[in-house]
Amino acid sequence: MTIEVLNVSKNYEGKPYLKNVSLDISSGSVISVVGAKKSGKTALLRIIMGLEEADDGQVNLLGDYKYDRFNIGAVFQDDHLCPGFTAAQNVAMVNERISVRAAEEELEKLLPAGTADLPVEDLTPAQRRMVCIIRACIIPSDVRLMDEPFAGMTEEEREKSIAYIHSILANTPLVITCLPGEELPFGRTFHLT
């Protein structure tokens, strides 16, 4: 499976955010899309996901998909967690094959003991990001796209989250966006200017 981004451009309020961006995302690839704030990182992911249209260029989905439709495991800049539910319930609700107990076990890989049973509104911002990462990784996906997944994390939380992501990659391509200096220690780096 390959996602081909060809000469994608996007303007906001007359300002170019993306200009002729081309990127090949193939099975097993890991790409850190690095850029300053307002460089178009989020717009690029949203275009790949089909949530926004490019002004110019195209995104092509090539090859065979593992599932009936193109599935994306995503971490957005906003948490998109369901308030009133525990961390484990938020993880379990995205995959009907995952029980709340299995979600708790997965969350224990990143969160302090007992945290999985807390309502998500009682978690720290970094802990909520970790719930989002696990939720994106537990969904059967053709690709995983993560928009600044480590925002607000301490170095220890970031390293733990990176190790978790690395442990579950297999052949599913991963694209993350990050600020300069925050790229993954594995895979390749693509700079937006």
Q: What are these language model-derived features?
A:
Residues 57-68:
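Conserved ABC transporter NBD signature motif
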Residues 85-102:
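Q-loop/switch helix immediately C-terminal to the Walker
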Residues 49:
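Helix-to-loop junction immediately C-terminal to a conserved catalytic motif
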Residues 3, 18-20:
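Conserved structural motif at the start of ABC-family nucleotide-binding domains
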Residues 119-123, 127:
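Conserved ABC ATPase signature
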Residues 100-115:
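Conserved ABC ATPase "signature" region
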Residues 133:
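Hydrophobic anchor residue at the start of the ABC signature
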